[in-house]
Amino acid sequence: MIQEQTMLNVADNSGARRVMCIKVLGGSHRRYAGVGDIIKITIKEAIPRGKVKKGDVLKPVVVRTNKGVRRPDGSVIRFDGNACVLLNNNSEQPIGTRIFGPVTRELRSEKFMKIISLAPEVL
């Protein structure tokens, strides 16, 4: 569950390390975002010479949460941290060329097939 002011790790090689959620998109009073949801973030920590810099405002997709994802069979998949993959603001394609760590099968929609194909493991 991601809400405003939540700090997330970045699971790609775009150059950002830590980001902070500034808005959960999708509805006027929507409070929480889960895996597969698009949020609005600002970059709080970035590496030198990366594709993005500190202070940039972007729209990533959430790929891992501490809260986890409940499957129809009743199982829950939880992770040790909250992570996201940064997307291009207009094309909604990933900025990075590599994805680090596992992602869940819930991302298998037409919009995020590129992330699924780049990920080393799909749970």
Swiss-Prot record:
GO terms for molecular function: large ribosomal subunit rRNA binding; structural constituent of ribosome. The keyword rRNA-binding applies. InterPro entries: Ribosomal_uL14, Ribosomal_uL14_bac-type, Ribosomal_uL14_sf. Pfam families: Ribosomal_L14. Gene3D superfamilies: Ribosomal protein L14. SUPFAM superfamilies: Ribosomal protein L14. GO terms for cellular component: cytosolic large ribosomal subunit. GO terms for biological process: translation. Keywords: Ribonucleoprotein, Ribosomal protein, RNA-binding, rRNA-binding. Coiled coil: none annotated. Part of the 50S ribosomal subunit. Forms a cluster with proteins L3 and L19. In the 70S ribosome, L14 and L19 interact and together make contacts with the 16S rRNA in bridges B5 and B8. Binds to 23S rRNA. Forms part of two intersubunit bridges in the 70S ribosome. Belongs to the universal ribosomal protein uL14 family. This is Large ribosomal subunit protein uL14.
